[in-house]
Amino acid sequence: MSNDSSECSQKLPKLKRILLKLSGESLSADQGFGINVESAQPIINQIKTLTNFGVELALVVGGGNILRGGRANFGNKIRRATADSMGMIATMINALALRDMLISEGVDAEVFSAKGVDGLLKVASAHEFNQELAKGRVLIFAGGTGNPFVTTDTTASLRAVEIGADALLKATTVNGVYDKDPNKYSDAKRFDKVTFSEVVSKELNVMDLGAFTQCRDFGIPIYVFDLTQPNALVDAVLDSKYGTWVTLD
């Protein structure tokens, strides 16, 4: 898709309300750790474009650029539950950064967290979400589900259900779902579209199994796409050239 905003403006979004799942690493770029504001700016710009189109948008961001929680190598010195709690705090840091970057571009945004922090983070309250989204406010969900032993994919599926999302968009560095690992096999085949049943029968890798099952059970399509492509987030809503749709049977 062209970066020309005039071309974008001639198209109408296919989705009205979406849940975008971002990895923490998408904020760190090549440095691999922390937050790189300049590298994150294209994401902010695309979110602004979508809100200008009238798309209602909520985000779930991971914390892997700061700490990967249960995947961190702490040996037996730090319990898994504690490591996961540390990972939840990392998502809060990222969410606050995203909020301020959006506000700096004139985009109204608010953070809701599974665990509140007085004077800093509001506790997530599902009955508020519809009102906030209808105002055109971008919601950023932090703190995971508030429970250890689950991934931010699960947070994304849960929040997608709570807000009644038309789709869950999972931003990755791979342009969709393949029949096998494209990083290992040069003959790997990419799917433009695949059903939930086919994902199960072919044992394809889409996202955390619990999150995948929740989306299937509540009828929420999943779009897996390569965020590193030019204007990929806007394309996900307008054209869907850079990824794979997982849909109901």
Curated annotation (Swiss-Prot):
Cell location: Cytoplasm
Principal location listed in the UniProt entry: cytoplasm
Residues binding UMP, per UniProt: 63, 84, 145-152
Pfam families: AA_kinase
Domain of life, per lineage: Bacteria
Annotated pathway: Pyrimidine metabolism; CTP biosynthesis via de novo pathway; UDP from UMP (UMPK route): step 1/1
Record bears the keyword Cell membrane: no
EC number assigned by the record: 2.7.4.22
Keyword Isomerase set for record: no
SUPFAM superfamilies referenced in this protein's UniProt entry, alphabetically: Carbamate kinase-like (SSF53633)
Activity control mechanisms: Inhibited by UTP.
Keywords noted in UniProt: ATP-binding, Cytoplasm, Kinase, Nucleotide-binding, Pyrimidine biosynthesis, Transferase
Substrates-to-products reaction catalysed: UMP + ATP = UDP + ADP
A biological-process GO annotation: UDP biosynthetic process
Cellular component terms per the entry's GO annotation: cytoplasm
Gene Ontology terms, MF aspect: ATP binding; UMP kinase activity
Subunit structure: Homohexamer.
Family: Belongs to the UMP kinase family.
Function (record text): Catalyzes the reversible phosphorylation of UMP to UDP.
Protein name: Uridylate kinase
Native organism: Francisella tularensis subsp. tularensis (strain SCHU S4 / Schu 4)
